[in-house]
Amino acid sequence: MRSIYCGQLNKTHVDQEVELCGWINKRRDLGGLIFVDLRDREGLVQVVFDSDIEELMSSANTLRQEFCVQLKGIVRARPDSQVNKDMPTGEIEILGTELNIINRSEPLPLDFNQVNSEERRLKYRYLDLRRLEMSDRIKLRAKASSFVRRFLDENGFLDIETPVLTKATPEGARDYLVPSRVHKGSFYALPQSPQLFKQLLMMSGFDRYYQIVKCFRDEDLRADRQPEFTQIDIETSFMSSDQVRGMTEKMIREMWQTLLNVDLGDFPIMPYSEAMSLYGSDKPDLRNPMKLVDIADLVKDVEFNVFSGPANDEKGRVAVLTVPGGAKLSRKQLDDYTKFIGIYGAKGMAWMKVNDHTAGAEGVQSPVAKFLTADVITQLLERTNAQSGDIILFGADKRNTVNEAMGALRVKIGIDLEITNLDSWAPLWVVDFPMFEEDDEGTLHAVHHPFTAPKDMSASELEANPAAAISDAYDMVLNGYEVGGGSVRIHNADMQEAAFRILGINEQEQQDKFGFLLDALKYGTPPHAGLAFGLDRLAMLLCGTDNIRDVIAFPKTTQASCLLTNAPSKPNADSLAELAISVVEKAVLSAE
């Protein structure tokens, strides 16, 4: 039915007869001539109907937007005055000689000439995907997938599938559970990742594994998260963390070079502690030059408990962010930023405008200046290297609150004030994460997952001082997004059992949930390490969008629903009975 795609035509095809298939993007009637823009997945081409054949012209006259058609025609060069430089096929047009209307279209529920709401786009996703902007994104994602497969195949990796119906294991988020009809009352879990199976493959002797695989997490959604997502999953035996990073960095660098003609350069390596200290985040956006500066030592003795309290608390932090040119911010803007950091638990935000950095305390304007001595202000200006016209923003609270609030504020102000260079790329590796972190109740949790190996520690040393353990883990960060993360895995049963005990998983629970893994670790397990990339997030960055739904053909909303199919839906009573499931409505008690 088709001899070539519309978007592939150019001047080399002049005088050739072609067969095209696609949709009518636009129609224009100019007297005796009928012009249409025909669209397929590769682009647009202009078709002209100018014929004495009454049947052809009559049929062309009925064409409307999104009619699906097949046509034949002759490629001809446009006159110089009619060349459309904004169109890749703008040097040529097709003189239509035959037309077959395959299917007509009703008036569209989407207007392709204006911005439609995301809800409407998702409800009519099959129409939304016809837009060239969307089809280009899906094609670029497909190219990224193909590139990954080629690269890993050429480097000796085997594409091996792992189960989708599996056992629930604690990996940080809630599982999606699937009831078993055969084993009534029992449930499978959809995998949050193939983590344990890929480790078992290493124990099976498949020393280089990969898989582009669907994963599932029942968690609150954001613009860059989905309940089902696609992971580029990689695992290797007999490779160090340095070697894994080197190989996967090479893959991403070559991907960007191939698909975008961008050289990312060598990725700098930053310890987790440095990332948190300077940027308040373990995924810093290095396109933004602003850094946090600690000032606890300067304010620990001031008569202002908002500063001195956290400064003298071992779990507290007092840090400042110097914003170049920020003195021009209005009081309303500062109030808005104060509300913004409140989302992250911050109770307020002090500020200091620098009118003349050479004048010390006399050159600043701040509601907290009265609590600070002239010497403290002078030292503050020197430490931050603040210049005239800058503003210094203060964060003082528990360390985690300051990091989250000031880290997020740094990102927001960087974009709002155009400090962040959005036209650049800034990759890095973040390494040396703590193995465990403590919650507000003092309970330890794994920073990554319970199968991550510590650096230079025995099992007994790990149990004796888990808070000091540094994991052999690594995250790849690009423009403030974590695009991949991995680690060296525990390959010794004693170490794995010690890690479980630290996390409060007793021996019985270890056997119930991980008995198969602990058994496998007893039979000559090789050292192994791996990494997983989020394909959706990589595609989002490649396509230059900040919404992950833009690069998924049929995504879910932030409420984890599909507006196209109305999933999830309630099953019928017979289906539930067959699974021995009853739905209990939760009673809502009103206070009287």
Curated annotation (Swiss-Prot):
Name of the protein: Aspartate--tRNA ligase
Keyword Protein biosynthesis: yes
Originating organism: Pseudoalteromonas translucida (strain TAC 125)
NCBIfam families: aspS_bact, PRK00476.1
GO MF annotation: an example: ATP binding
GO CC annotation terms, alphabetical: cytoplasm
Chain positions recorded as L-aspartate binding sites: 171, 217, 448, 489
Region of interest (Aspartate), residue spans: 195-198
Residues that hold ATP according to the record: 217-219, 226, 482, 534-537
Keyword rRNA-binding: no
UniProt GO BP: aspartyl-tRNA aminoacylation
Subunit structure: Homodimer.
E.C. number: 6.1.1.12
UniProt-annotated location(s): Cytoplasm
Job description of the protein: Catalyzes the attachment of L-aspartate to tRNA(Asp) in a two-step reaction: L-aspartate is first activated by ATP to form Asp-AMP and then transferred to the acceptor end of tRNA(Asp).
Family (UniProt): Belongs to the class-II aminoacyl-tRNA synthetase family. Type 1 subfamily.
Top-level lineage group: Bacteria
